[in-house]
Amino acid sequence: MKIHLNGEPHNAEAGTTLEGLLMGLGFAPEKVAVERNKAVVSRGTYGAVVLQEDDQIEVVHFIGGGQHPPADSWSVAGLTFNSRLLVGTGKYKDFEETKIAIEASGAEIVTVAVRRVNVSNPNAPMLTDYIDPKKYTYLPNTAGCFTAEDAVRTLRLAREAGGWDLVKLEVLSDEKYLWPNNPETLKAAEILVQEGFKVMVYTTDDPHMCKRFEDLGCVAVMPLAAPIGSGLGVRNPYTTRIIVEQAKVPVLVDAGVGTASDAAIAMELGCDGVLMNTAIAGAKDPILMAHAMKHAVLAGRQAYLAGRIQKKLYATASSPLDGTFF
């Protein structure tokens, strides 16, 4: 038997009811409205209405008005992500808290350090038992490395362990300030790029250095906002803005974020994303802070896209003065 369903020819078995048609299509009868031959059919009678040859059936439901906004995704090394918040996996009280916080943050990329296994307890829990590498993009880093040699060794092992080519390179100058050692970082970056690694590089908020790393072949530059773990926020928005304007690769603020407003400021400057660890893991309530950071990054990004008003010395009335009665 042939009927017309939403303007298109449709075959139905003889004796099929409206309810049977809807269920066969996968629609819950209580979520739609049906018109048969231009007459609305009462929902309570769907099971009793038997379809006839050439019936004209319209099935409708509610949708939101307007168009869905386009996804504001970003890409690095050929991979596309929706979340612009990247998070670390250290400093949490246990792996369970790590898992819950990452889920709350909405992050898709998580940084992981490479460390020796516990040979005395091979059954000890590992991060991969809680954070699924198939669900999240692991970003191996070189945290704790102070020489180019150590950084390169670390990432070679990371690639062997998980097959990861996308990596975060950081080479530090000292243990007190954890400031980037740019000469050693450059040396390591050159080797890693030649070996096929896709390097996201942690560096100072220096436009010249960021440009050098980009020219070397790094797929993203990650200037610090402030020293690692300091929570001081974006200390030099001027140079961060210059880095964003000149870069042809993603720019992500890395290190120094302390609270949600810091993340929002970084995004308002036009950064493609923000990476943080201590700001979430070190909070009194890491799970709640993870939620806050998720919304802060989104708010900052939307504010950047919307375009802030110009800063001015004098006031401008928001209500028109024309038509006042005094």
Swiss-Prot record:
The keyword Nucleotidyltransferase does not apply. The active site is at residue 168. Pathway: Cofactor biosynthesis; thiamine diphosphate biosynthesis. It comes from the Bacteria. Transmembrane segments: none annotated. It catalyses: [ThiS sulfur-carrier protein]-C-terminal-Gly-aminoethanethioate + 2-iminoacetate + 1-deoxy-D-xylulose 5-phosphate = [ThiS sulfur-carrier protein]-C-terminal Gly-Gly + 2-[(2R,5Z)-2-carboxy-4-methylthiazol-5(2H)-ylidene]ethyl phosphate + 2 H2O + H(+). The keyword Transferase applies. GO terms for biological process: thiamine diphosphate biosynthetic process. Keywords: Cytoplasm, Schiff base, Thiamine biosynthesis, Transferase. 1-deoxy-D-xylulose 5-phosphate binds at residues 229, 255-256, 277-278. Its EC number is 2.8.1.10. One of its GO terms (molecular function) is thiazole synthase activity. It is found in: Cytoplasm. One of its GO terms (cellular component) is cytoplasm. Catalyzes the rearrangement of 1-deoxy-D-xylulose 5-phosphate (DXP) to produce the thiazole phosphate moiety of thiamine. Sulfur is provided by the thiocarboxylate moiety of the carrier protein ThiS. In vitro, sulfur can be provided by H(2)S. Belongs to the ThiG family. HAMAP family: ThiG. Homotetramer. Forms heterodimers with either ThiH or ThiS. This is Thiazole synthase. The lineage of its organism: Bacteria, Pseudomonadati, Pseudomonadota, Alphaproteobacteria, Magnetococcales.
